[in-house]
Amino acid sequence: MIASSVKAEVVKSNARSANDTGSPEVQVALLTARINELTPHFKQHAKDHHGRRGLLRMVSRRRKLLDYLKSKDADRYTALIAKLGLRK
């Protein structure tokens, strides 16, 4: 679980306007923060298959949001993946 201060910082740094909490950019950034926080857990606990299912669900949801953003506005998509360091 992400600390509320970290979550607020992620929202603030990726928001398109002052009160923006639901744009695809913010949602992808929050999912990325949660995924990055869970990744070390699975390095230590390789047999946690129930938790891994939740992680894969988050990755899938992030992928769908990125696909949506790419189809709607490719410039915002490329800026977001560069900012989050998702693709090479």
UniProtKB/Swiss-Prot annotation:
MF (Gene Ontology): rRNA binding; structural constituent of ribosome
Region (Disordered): 1-23
Record keywords: Ribonucleoprotein, Ribosomal protein, RNA-binding, rRNA-binding
Biased composition regions of type Polar residues, renumbered to the chain: 14-23
Gene Ontology terms: cellular component: cytosolic small ribosomal subunit
rRNA-binding as UniProt keyword: yes
Keyword Chaperone: no
One Pfam assignment: Ribosomal_S15
Superkingdom of the organism of origin: Bacteria
SMART domains: Ribosomal_S15
GO biological process: translation
Recorded family membership: Belongs to the universal ribosomal protein uS15 family.
UniProt function note: One of the primary rRNA binding proteins, it binds directly to 16S rRNA where it helps nucleate assembly of the platform of the 30S subunit by binding and bridging several RNA helices of the 16S rRNA.
Subunit structure: Part of the 30S ribosomal subunit. Forms a bridge to the 50S subunit in the 70S ribosome, contacting the 23S rRNA.
Stated name of the protein: Small ribosomal subunit protein uS15
Gene: rpsO
